[in-house]
């Protein structure tokens, strides 16, 4: 197999780090512009289907996989309809039925996703392709609407003013990660089994995120007790505010959780799939981790300290996974 270059690792990081902001902006535009944003969503679904078709055909060529594009496209039509329906149902439920957005997402998005995942784990991985054209369209619409507002600080300000919706984007992050995995499959750099393992992890992490939001928003436990119960860093308790009608979360929490997910995914693909040597993977991960930590430290020193600790855990777990994979491969060769 070819090696993953530094640029490709950076692209994996960029996709995961950037997509939540694009989706957040697209949601804001959907509320402000209505029908135009709805048409853009439908267009994004068809663009995503074209991307999926090309990815499946390329995977056939590179991995000699007996893929069935027609089956994948049919499944993607269904998943596209589910996510688009969930977006509109969220708006209608909040307007007419007084239902919170998380209930609409849980009923119309999470339930069929879990069913499809348990029925055939590989089906759920292709849901994330829809997020790629959404990211492009969100930024293009924002730039055409008001070029002066296109700045990172305005995005951060909007995220803090709409913290509840921004926290709900954390449920989408695992699916965005699967989009990065699909890109690796497209390049022929990882075995399908590796991608399906990551897909299953993303599914379960999404379920636990939803469960965690319910527990924290109920206010039964305190912030620190809830964090311990969910095996989350105590630093998350500092930024959660219990007791308000809305569950408010600072933007920095999503930052370092997302980046940690990127690093673990990149390291897992590098070491477990055997696409690069162990030393080369270690150098790339350490370089990216330190660079990202420096950026986070500029904005928030407490988050930087916790993030540095999380990097150590991620690198250690990834290295152990790589060593176990190498030992198993050695036993099979003997």
Regions of interest found by a model, annotated:
Residues 18, 22-104, 110-111:
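Membrane helical hairpin/interfacial module
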Residues 85-100, 188-209, 267-289:
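Helix-loop-helix connectors at the membrane interface of multi-pass transporters/channels
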């Amino acid at each position: 197999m070819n090696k993953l270059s530094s640029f490709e690792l950076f692209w994996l990081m960029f996709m995961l780090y950037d997509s939540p902001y694009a989706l957040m902006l697209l949601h804001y535009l959907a509320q402000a512009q209505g029908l135009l944003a709805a048409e853009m969503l439908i267009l994004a679904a068809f663009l995503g289907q074209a991307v999926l078709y090309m990815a499946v055909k390329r995977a056939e060529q590179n991995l000699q996989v007996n893929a069935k594009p027609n089956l994948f496209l049919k499944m993607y039509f269904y998943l596209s309809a589910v996510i688009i329906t969930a977006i509109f149902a969220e708006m209608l439920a909040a307007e007419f039925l007084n239902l919170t957005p998380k209930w609409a997402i849980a009923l119309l998005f999470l339930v069929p996703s879990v069913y499809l995942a348990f029925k055939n784990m590989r089906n759920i991985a292709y849901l994330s392709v829809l997020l790629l054209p959404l990211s492009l369209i969100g930024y293009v619409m924002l730039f055409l609407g008001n070029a002066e507002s296109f700045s990172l600080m305005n995005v951060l300000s909007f995220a803090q003013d709409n913290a509840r919706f921004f926290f709900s984007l954390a449920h989408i992050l695992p699916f965005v990660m699967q989009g990065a995995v699909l890109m690796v499959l497209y390049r022929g750099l990882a075995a399908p089994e590796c991608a399906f393992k990551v897909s299953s992890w993303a599914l379960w992490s999404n379920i636990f995120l939803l469960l965690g939001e319910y527990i924290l928003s109920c206010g039964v436990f305190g912030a620190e007790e809830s964090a311990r119960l969910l095996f989350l860093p105590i630093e998350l308790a500092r930024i959660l505010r219990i007791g308000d009608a809305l569950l408010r979360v600072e933007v920095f929490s999503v930052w370092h959780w997302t980046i940690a997910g990127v690093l673990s995914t990149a390291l897992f693909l590098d070491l477990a799939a055997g696409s690069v040597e162990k030393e080369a993977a270690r150098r790339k991960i350490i370089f990216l981790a330190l660079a990202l930590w420096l950026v986070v430290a500029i904005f928030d020193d407490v988050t930087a300290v916790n993030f540095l600790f999380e990097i150590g855990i991620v690198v250690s777990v990834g290295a152990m996974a790589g060593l176990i994979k190498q030992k198993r491969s050695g036993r099979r060769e003997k």
